[in-house]
């Protein structure tokens, strides 16, 4: 039996450069990845370098709220 809340939670990572450069509107969308993280090991917000198909390069993807 599990105690309290689940340790692993599903999170969404969103491209930070697409969000900032939304004014230019060169891209047709915002890159998002769905992954899981362990709350005990990483209590803070997660940031990973992932490939953004709209920017055509590797950028920092930050965790967003659901």
UniProtKB/Swiss-Prot annotation:
InterPro entries tied to this protein: Ribosomal_bL33, Ribosomal_bL33_CS, Ribosomal_bL33_sf, Ribosomal_zn-bd
Compartments, record wording: Plastid, Chloroplast
One Pfam match: Ribosomal_L33
Molecular function terms from GO: structural constituent of ribosome
Keyword Ribonucleoprotein: yes
Entry keyword Chloroplast: yes
One GO cellular component, as annotated: chloroplast
GO biological process: translation
PROSITE patterns, A to Z: RIBOSOMAL_L33 (PS00582)
Key words of the record: Chloroplast, Plastid, Ribonucleoprotein, Ribosomal protein
SUPFAM superfamilies tied to this protein: Zn-binding ribosomal proteins (SSF57829)
Matches recorded under PANTHER family: 50S RIBOSOMAL PROTEIN L33, CHLOROPLASTIC, LARGE RIBOSOMAL SUBUNIT PROTEIN BL33C
HAMAP family: Ribosomal_bL33 (MF_00294)
UniProt similarity note: Belongs to the bacterial ribosomal protein bL33 family.
Protein name stated in the entry: Large ribosomal subunit protein bL33c
Organism, scientific name: Olimarabidopsis pumila (Dwarf rocket)
Native organism taxonomy: Eukaryota, Viridiplantae, Streptophyta, Embryophyta, Tracheophyta
Annotated gene: rpl33
């Amino acid at each position: 039996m599990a105690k309290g809340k689940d340790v692993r939670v599903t999170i969404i990572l969103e491209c930070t450069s697409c969000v900032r450069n939304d004014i230019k509107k060169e891209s047709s969308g915002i890159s998002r990845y769905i992954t899981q993280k362990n709350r005990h090991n990483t209590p803070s917000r997660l940031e990973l370098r992932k490939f953004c198909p709209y920017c055509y390069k590797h950028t920092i993807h930050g965790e967003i709220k659901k």
